[in-house]
């Protein structure tokens, strides 16, 4: 068998009552709800790894040396966790409060149609009000989505769950 060739194997599970046409219909219904009814938009700032300057020794990147692909708007179903009152040190004198973590679901088909992907370290922007865009950094890109929660009736993966944590202002403030 040629190792450079990929064989496609048809999905035949559930074939008595569910097939690829039904799967496509379910995707269309779900996308209509997420992209039409909910209409929650995030902006993906995807890092262009090839054009980003890295340190020769440690392969670290300074924020000013990061290069990005053009921003892409994505329609998602998102949730932002409640913020927490935290301290910088054990004494509790220096306190701060920031937004909570963000988790969102996105249809994989939308990413393919837009010719983009979400990966670890990318930044996500979200308008929290009319004047403020807040940024999060991707900590789980959700690329493995074959579990029951992310499939439609266990047939095939449909949605990805992406987890993000608040980006520090020194790390990213938009482009």
Where are these regions (language model features)?
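Core residues of folded domains in eukaryotic genome-function proteins
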Residues: 100-102, 120-122, 132-134, 158-160
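Short alpha-helix capping/helix-loop boundary micro-motifs
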Residues: 100-116
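Intrinsically disordered, low-complexity terminal/linker regions enriched in Pro/Ser/Gly
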Residues: 171-175
């Amino acid at each position: 068998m040629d190792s450079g060739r990929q064989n496609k194997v048809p999905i035949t599970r559930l074939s008595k009552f569910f097939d690829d046409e039904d799967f496509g219909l379910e995707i269309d219904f779900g996308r209509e709800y997420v992209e039409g009814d909910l209409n929650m938009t995030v902006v993906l700032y995807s890092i262009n790894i090839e054009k980003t300057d890295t340190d020769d020794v440690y392969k670290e990147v300074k924020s000013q040396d990061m290069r990005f692909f053009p921003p892409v708007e994505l329609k998602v179903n998102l949730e932002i966790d409640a913020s927490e009152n935290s301290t910088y040190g054990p004494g509790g004198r220096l306190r701060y409060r920031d937004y909570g973590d963000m988790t969102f679901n996105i249809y994989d088909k939308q990413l393919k149609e837009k010719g983009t992907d979400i990966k670890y370290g990318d930044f996500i922007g979200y308008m929290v009000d009319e004047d403020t865009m807040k940024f999060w950094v991707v900590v789980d890109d959700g690329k493995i989505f074959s579990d029951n929660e992310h499939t439609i009736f266990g047939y095939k993966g449909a949605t990805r769950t992406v987890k993000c944590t608040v980006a520090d202002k020194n790390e990213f403030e938009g482009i």
